[in-house]
Amino acid sequence: MPELPEVEVTRRSFAGAIEGATVRGITVGKPLRWPLGTEPAVLVGRRVCGVRRRGKYLLLDLDEGLLLIHLGMSGSLRFARDLPARGAHDHFELITDQGTLRLHDPRRFGAVVWAAGESDPRARKLLDGWGLEPLGEDFAFETFHAGLRAKRTPIKQLLLAGTVVVGVGNIYACEVLFLAGIRPTTRACAIGPQRARRLHGAIREVLARAVERGGSTLRDFSSADGSAGHFQLEANVYGRAGLPCRQCGTPVRLLRQGQRSTYFCPHCQRA
């Protein structure tokens, strides 16, 4: 599933090119996770004012309303003036005078939803309840630590839930906890101020590095210009079960938490 770094990389790869574009048409294929929420003709003539990100959602601001885009489990966006003919898994196109934005989504768990604004119930249903933006200025340590202290959930699962900090997916949660030296099964409320500060810094560091490396391409992720990500090539623990820890040589272990694979070093992450 594309996580925060992949969504941010996608945003950066087409935001400048589509800004100021006028919508000329909409193509809707097979149904996605949620309906568009308006007739496609309503969007024709609208101007694209910018592209933002909130967690794993892209917000395409129009001069009237906005489009919320989620890539689902296997989705990716492409933006270009001359895209090849639509394929069987291309389910949405925003055709503009500056190029076409196309959603490719084989499993159809993604979505494109129109809302009149961020206060629209359709937008609030998708955006409300998420935690702090880890790459934003409001990612304050005090607020983050207070969120940890209030939860008895194992820290790995709390990171994935997105209610304290948003967008830390499975790969990045494993890498963040390794960098912070915290075992994934440790209860969030048991993490004291010193370790919480290390965790806070590790979240910023890992996600920023992942964006810099173009995200992670495990199966089919690519950005809107077709580029693959490379962060997975330098992972310390993710996908390395049984291999020696890059830091101490102890074999990396694998366990299951909430139906997700968790990788950690039992020596470097003792508690």
Curated annotation (Swiss-Prot):
Zinc fingers (FPG-type) by residue: 236-270
Record keywords: DNA damage, DNA repair, DNA-binding, Glycosidase, Hydrolase, Lyase, Metal-binding, Multifunctional enzyme, Zinc, Zinc-finger
Annotated EC: 3.2.2.23, 4.2.99.18
Cofactor binding note of this UniProt entry: Binds 1 zinc ion per subunit.
Role summary: Involved in base excision repair of DNA damaged by oxidation or by mutagenic agents. Acts as a DNA glycosylase that recognizes and removes damaged bases. Has a preference for oxidized purines, such as 7,8-dihydro-8-oxoguanine (8-oxoG). Has AP (apurinic/apyrimidinic) lyase activity and introduces nicks in the DNA strand. Cleaves the DNA backbone by beta-delta elimination to generate a single-strand break at the site of the removed base with both 3'- and 5'-phosphates.
InterPro entries with a match to the protein in the record: DNA_glyclase/AP_lyase_DNA-bd (IPR015886), DNA_glyclase_Znf_dom_DNA_BS (IPR015887), Formamido-pyr_DNA_Glyclase (IPR020629), FPG_cat (IPR012319), MutM-like_N-ter (IPR035937), Ribosomal_uS13-like_H2TH (IPR010979), Znf_DNA_glyclase/AP_lyase (IPR000214), Znf_FPG/IleRS (IPR010663)
Gene that this polypeptide is encoded by: mutM
Family assignment from sequence similarity: Belongs to the FPG family.
Annotated catalytic residues: P2 (schiff-base intermediate with dna), E3 (proton donor), K56 (proton donor), R260 (proton donor)
Catalysed reaction equations from the record: Hydrolysis of DNA containing ring-opened 7-methylguanine residues, releasing 2,6-diamino-4-hydroxy-5-(N-methyl)formamidopyrimidine; 2'-deoxyribonucleotide-(2'-deoxyribose 5'-phosphate)-2'-deoxyribonucleotide-DNA = a 3'-end 2'-deoxyribonucleotide-(2,3-dehydro-2,3-deoxyribose 5'-phosphate)-DNA + a 5'-end 5'-phospho-2'-deoxyribonucleoside-DNA + H(+)
Keyword hit for Zinc: yes
Obligatory cofactor(s): Zn(2+)
GO MF terms held by the record: 8-oxo-7,8-dihydroguanine DNA N-glycosylase activity; class I DNA-(apurinic or apyrimidinic site) endonuclease activity; damaged DNA binding; zinc ion binding
Keyword Cell membrane found: no
Origin species: Acidovorax sp. (strain JS42)
Sequence positions that bind DNA: H89, R107, K151
PROSITE patterns attached to this UniProt entry: FPG_CAT, ZF_FPG_1, ZF_FPG_2
Assembly with partners or alone: Monomer.
Superkingdom of source: Bacteria
Identification of the protein by name: Formamidopyrimidine-DNA glycosylase
